[in-house]
């Protein structure tokens, strides 16, 4: 059993774990970026900050805000 744990741990170190997350696109003061129903501004801003894509999340709890997928 100990060998299995050690081998699993070694594989994680060798392979490397790269994780991404989804989340709101925010300004430096941690305020969300509001958007109009057009997702182009969100997509450009999210990609500029390392995400794979961005969209305008309409009618959410905080209003129309930018949502990014795959943030690094």
UniProtKB/Swiss-Prot annotation:
Disulfide bonds join 35-56, 42-66, 46-68. CDD domains: neurotoxins_LC_scorpion. GO terms for biological process: defense response. It is found in: Secreted. Its main location: secreted. Expressed by the venom gland. One of its GO terms (molecular function) is sodium channel inhibitor activity. GO terms for cellular component: extracellular region. Pfam families: Toxin_3. Residues 1-19 form the signal peptide. Keywords: Disulfide bond, Ion channel impairing toxin, Neurotoxin, Secreted, Signal, Toxin. PROSITE patterns: LCN_CSAB (PS51863). It comes from the Eukaryota. Residues 21-72 form the LCN-type CS-alpha/beta domain. Has the structural arrangement of an alpha-helix connected to antiparallel beta-sheets by disulfide bonds (CS-alpha/beta). Belongs to the long (3 C-C) scorpion toxin superfamily. This is Probable neurotoxin pcD-1008. It comes from Androctonus australis.
